[in-house]
């Protein structure tokens, strides 16, 4: 059976997640800071989960099981590793809110071009529905982060200018093993970067609003 030619439960989950984007806050009008954070966290959670499930679906469809461990140890270097972004919750706690927002913005913007080619990675392009939808979700999150930065910029010192890393486009020639491994590595980076953004936003939201049930 050709890869991507049938619907696995995971595949259905990916499609469902793509449709369940929070509609109650399609834009970021003037609103309380707590609401801005809540909306941004919700968007980051959806994108991270979508990226994780898509990575798993790609792995299931194209990477033989006996090669997965080896490939994971040699996956592509992530451009996000070239900036001094925190790698986890404890590191993020040491950064100011504005620093975390700047890191988040750089990570999001580094994927705006590559994701426009993402639907061509799968033989069945119903994964993600269309690249445009993923692009729009990233743009929404970018807008939310920028709204938070506008709210906080007068209260925080301006940090150093960050270099903006960029990722290669996804390769659509899936019969080529090098292309498969390149896309596998890119999807891994996409998942890792969105996990970082989700973590940063949760750290900021939790320490600002002191939620007793806060989980990161």
Curated annotation (Swiss-Prot):
Cysteine-cysteine disulfides: 78-189, 206-214
GO cellular component, one term: extracellular space
CDD domains: somatotropin_like
Amino-acid positions noted as binding Zn(2+) in the UniProt annotation, renumbered to this chain: 46, 198
One Gene Ontology term from the biological process aspect of the record: oviduct epithelium development
GO molecular function, one term: hormone activity
Cellular localisation: Secreted
Function: Growth hormone plays an important role in growth control.
Similarity comment text for this entry: Belongs to the somatotropin/prolactin family.
UniProt-listed PANTHER family: SOMATOTROPIN, SOMATOTROPIN,PROLACTIN
Name of the protein described by the UniProt record: Somatotropin
Originating species: Anas platyrhynchos
């Amino acid at each position: 059976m050709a890869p991507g030619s049938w619907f696995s439960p995971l595949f259905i989950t990916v499609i469902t997640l793509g449709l369940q984007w929070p509609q109650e806050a399609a834009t970021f009008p003037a609103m309380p800071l707590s609401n801005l954070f809540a909306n941004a966290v919700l968007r980051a959670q959806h994108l991270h989960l979508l990226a994780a499930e898509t990575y798993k679906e790609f792995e299931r469809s194209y990477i033989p099981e006996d090669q997965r461990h080896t490939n994971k140890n040699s996956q592509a270097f992530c451009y996000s590793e070239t900036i001094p972004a925190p790698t986890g919750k404890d590191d993020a706690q040491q950064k100011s809110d504005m620093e975390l927002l700047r890191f988040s913005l750089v990570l999001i913007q580094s994927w705006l071009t590559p994701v426009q080619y993402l639907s061509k990675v799968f033989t069945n392009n119903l994964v993600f529905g269309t690249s445009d939808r993923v692009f729009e979700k990233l743009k929404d999150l970018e807008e939310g982060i920028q709204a938070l930065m506008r709210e906080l910029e007068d209260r925080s010192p301006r940090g150093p200018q960050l270099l903006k890393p960029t990722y290669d486009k996804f390769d659509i020639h899936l019969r080529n093993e090098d292309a498969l491994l390149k896309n596998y590595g890119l999807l891994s980076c996409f998942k890792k970067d969105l996990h970082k953004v989700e973590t940063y936003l949760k750290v900021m939201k939790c320490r600002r609003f002191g939620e007793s049930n806060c989980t990161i």
